[in-house]
């Protein structure tokens, strides 16, 4: 067996890959052994006698499976958590989404005539002050206190 380490080094440089990624066609070993210049190696690369193997990457298959399960709420228990609650769910973003939903609901009720503009303003201010935990809580309050409206 011929020592092709010099050719492998040249080929790695020509192909701009590491030596381990250089592939020699076993049927063309004689031609490869005769290649002593970079130009010779370039010609063999063009002919396909020398090629660069594909780079190996990390499979995302397991990560995709885990993502799919988490979309259903699985694998999210206490044993899977690393950060604090505030790092996993930003409290400001949580507040923003809740208050936007409540204000949208209030606007709908005002526009369809269920609430007068003064009731709307009163409830809007209460919502902004954090009186209601959710849209459902807001609706319960409206039913209890503005049921006649």
From Swiss-Prot:
Keyword set includes Membrane: no
Gene3D superfamilies: 1.10.1200.60, 1.10.1650.10, Single Heli x bin
GO MF terms held by the record: large ribosomal subunit rRNA binding; structural constituent of ribosome
UniProt cross-references to Pfam families, sorted A to Z: Ribosomal_L19e, Ribosomal_L19e_C
One GO cellular component, as annotated: cytosolic large ribosomal subunit
Basic and acidic residues compositional bias, start-end: 90-113
PANTHER family: 60S RIBOSOMAL PROTEIN L19 (PTHR10722)
Protein name: Large ribosomal subunit protein eL19
Organism: Haloarcula marismortui (strain ATCC 43049 / DSM 3752 / JCM 8966 / VKM B-1809) (Halobacterium marismortui)
Taxonomic classification: Archaea, Methanobacteriati, Methanobacteriota, Stenosarchaea group, Halobacteria
């Amino acid at each position: 067996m011929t020592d092709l380490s010099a050719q492998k080094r040249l080929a790695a440089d020509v192909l701009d890959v590491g030596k381990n990624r250089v592939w020699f066609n076993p049927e063309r070993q004689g031609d490869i052994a005769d290649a002593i210049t970079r130009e010779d190696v370039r010609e063999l690369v063009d002919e396909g006698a020398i090629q660069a193997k594909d780079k190996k990457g990390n499979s995302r298959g397991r990560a995709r499976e885990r993502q799919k399960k988490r979309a259903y709420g699985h694998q999210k228990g206490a044993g899977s958590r690393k950060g604090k609650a505030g790092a996993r769910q930003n409290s400001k973003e949580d507040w923003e989404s809740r208050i936007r939903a409540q204000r949208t609901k209030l606007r709908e009720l005002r526009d369809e005539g269920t609430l007068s503009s003064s009731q709307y303003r009163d409830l809007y201010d209460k919502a902004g002050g954090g009186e209601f935990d959710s849209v459902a809580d807001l609706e319960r309050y409206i039913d209890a206190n503005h049921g006649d409206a």
